[in-house]
Structures are given as C-alpha cells and as structure tokens.
C-alpha cells in the first residue's frame, strides 16, 4: 500500500508540539501531541490529507500523537467495501433494525443532544477525564468544528437514543465520538453505531470509516480491532489487518511499538 507524504499545502501549515504530559491511554506513560495551529482555517480536502497522515480532530483542534519511544497510537480505518460483519456484529445489526437514522449538522445541536450526552457521561464514564460533563465541554468537543461535521442520529419512534459525531472526508468519514442512551444496553449501540457509519459511507460512494486511534495495550480500545479488514498506519504506510487478532497477538503488536524504530510486525498478519 502506498505511503502518504505531506503535499506542499500541508508543509505550509504551522504546527506546535506540546510538552510531555500523562498519557490518557496507558498508565505510567507520558505523551506529546503535535497540534495544527488553530489560526488555520482548513477545508475538507486539507483535513482529509491530515487524517491520512494520522491526524485527528477534537473541537477546533487537529492533532497527532508524537511520543518518545512509543508508537502505540495507530490510526485505523475500515475499508467499507471489504468489511464483513462477525457474528456479534450481525446480531447487533439485526437487533436495531427498528431504529431510524437522521443526519444533522453539528451546528444545529440542541438541548436534546446535550441531555443525552450528559446522561451518557454520568452513567458510563464517571471515572473518566470527561466527567463531570458540562454544556461548555459538549459544545467545545462536539459542536464546534473547523470543518464539515454532522450528527448521525438514531431514533426509536420519537426518542433520540444515539448520536455519532462525524467529520466528512473526501474519502469517507471520521468517527469523532458516539454517545447513547445508557438504558439501552441490550441494543449494543456502540457496535451498531459503527456499523451504521460503515453503511452510511457506502451510500455516499466513499471508501473509509476512520475510527481514530487503536492502542494495542489499552483494553478499552481493542474493540476497534474487531472491525475487519482494518487498515493501520504503520511506519507511514497504510497496512491491512485481515482478521481479528488474539490477545497474545495484540500484546505482541503493542510490544513492537514501544520504540521509535520501524515495526517488524508479522507480514503474514498485516499486509
């Protein structure tokens, strides 16, 4: 698969790197981030190029991890034309066929969206760094955007039960964040929301759903490896993971990334 290198336009942009700080994924590890100067007003094409280079958007900020002796934050994307549901995903898909999807620009967010977000954070992530939720946090994180962002809403009759915040890309969409009704745990809405995004990208005639970063040594991130085939940005190349990995293989991959040296990961598994 081909490497992606910054075009002249991207070389003209200004970037900043943060001082080391506690890693939000791995205990007892430090992290650094490269940020695009927020003074730049970027369009879909520029954000798409940056995403192919491993950048990610959060609110008005576009960033990429740049850590010393660690490369575990692997940008990952699902090639939608080749994606095949596993048995668990098929069950989640079937279980939610009574839901209706609508699309709404994030700038049209209302109280109903914040109320659902607040419940989700309070009940599902009270131990995380997004607790306690606030309207200001919600707006800065999910409503404000430097690009074309939208909600994929899921409704049960007249009740909003799930919202996926997405960025439009020139080759697909980037899944920014999903929140849902914590009382609907039997629906597996986290799984279904990703499946719904994959199907939505197919209807647009585009190629990928970007799932952000997969961190092999972070158990809470390993759900992303279940969407196969999955493409990973390794050593500047998008390489394909053709099947789900065992816990031992995931740990082996994580160990190989605790260095700044190029990966020698098994080419029979990742191609």
Curated annotation (Swiss-Prot):
A Pfam cross-reference name: ATE_C
Gene Ontology terms describing biological process: ubiquitin-dependent protein catabolic process via the N-end rule pathway
Localization per Swiss-Prot or TrEMBL: Cytoplasm
Catalytic activity: N-terminal L-glutamyl-[protein] + L-leucyl-tRNA(Leu) = N-terminal L-leucyl-L-glutamyl-[protein] + tRNA(Leu) + H(+); N-terminal L-aspartyl-[protein] + L-leucyl-tRNA(Leu) = N-terminal L-leucyl-L-aspartyl-[protein] + tRNA(Leu) + H(+)
UniProt keyword terms in alphabetical order: Acyltransferase, Cytoplasm, Transferase
KW Chaperone (keyword) present: no
Stored InterPro entries: Acyl_CoA_acyltransferase, Asp_Glu_LeuTrfase, N-end_Aminoacyl_Trfase, N-end_Aminoacyl_Trfase_C, N-end_Aminoacyl_Trfase_N
SUPFAM superfamilies: Acyl-CoA N-acyltransferases (Nat)
Cytoplasm found in the keyword field: yes
GO cellular component, one term: cytoplasm
Listed EC numbers: 2.3.2.29
Similarity section: Belongs to the R-transferase family. Bpt subfamily.
Protein name: Aspartate/glutamate leucyltransferase
């Amino acid at each position: 698969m081909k490497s992606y290198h910054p075009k002249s336009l991207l070389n003209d942009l200004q970037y900043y790197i943060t001082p080391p700080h506690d890693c939000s994924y791995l205990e007892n590890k430090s992290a650094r981030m490269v940020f695009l100067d927020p003074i730049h007003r970027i369009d879909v094409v520029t954000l798409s190029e940056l995403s192919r280079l491993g950048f990610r958007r959060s609110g008005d900020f576009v960033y990429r991890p740049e850590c010393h002796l660690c490369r575990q934050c692997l940008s990952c994307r699902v090639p939608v034309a080749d994606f095949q549901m596993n048995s668990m995903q098929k069950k989640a898909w079937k279980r939610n066929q009574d839901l209706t999807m609508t699309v709404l620009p994030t700038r049209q967010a209302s109280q109903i969206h914040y109320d659902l977000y607040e419940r989700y954070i309070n009940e599902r992530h009270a131990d995380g760094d997004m607790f306690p939720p606030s309207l200001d946090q919600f707006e800065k994180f999910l409503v404000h955007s430097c690009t074309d962002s939208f909600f994929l809403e899921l409704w049960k009759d007249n009740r909003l039960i799930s919202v996926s915040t997405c960025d439009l890309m020139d080759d697909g969409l980037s899944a920014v964040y999903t929140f849902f009704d914590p009382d609907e745990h039997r629906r597996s809405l986290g799984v279904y929301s990703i499946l719904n995004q994959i199907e939505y990208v197919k209807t647009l005639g585009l190629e990928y759903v970007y799932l952000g970063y997969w961190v092999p040594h972070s158990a809470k991130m390993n759900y992303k490896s279940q969407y196969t085939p999955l493409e990973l940005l390794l050593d500047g190349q998008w390489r394909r993971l053709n099947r789900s990995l065992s816990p031992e293989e995931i740990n082996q991959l994580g160990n190989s990334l605790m260095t700044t040296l190029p990966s020698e990961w098994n080419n029979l598994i990742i191609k």
